[in-house]
Amino acid sequence: HVKINVYIADDTFMAAGGGYKCSININDIQEVQLFNEMPKDNFTRTNGGSTNEYDIGNYKGRTYGKCMLFIWDGYSPVLMIKSSNKTVFVNSKEDGYIKQMYEKLTDYHK
């Protein structure tokens, strides 16, 4: 049974699940964006897990390039976080959680 955890701890954005982990220092975040659904970008899995329930791990998108996904299929919104060397997409099964995360991260950048 796979779990995906997305949280902020000690000024670091963390996403973990299925044996994959991504951490970005909040000061290194260059862009935070909220999407109604996962962008259609022909993502190709380079090293990760994919079922009809989730997509986790390392992927490559046509527009976004190398990125990490911690995505439950069929859940929205989707949060994209970009630093100089990483792009990560996350969502949650918990209603309102990702919007809250988005607001927290954009507050840091005011």
Question: Model-derived features: where do they sit?
Answer:
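Non-transmembrane, membrane-adjacent beta-strand/coil modules in membrane-associated proteins
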Residues: 16-25, 31-84
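Short amphipathic beta-strand/extended segments with alternating polar/hydrophobic composition
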Residues: 23-28, 89-93
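Terminal and domain-flanking low-complexity segments
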Residues: 38, 73-110
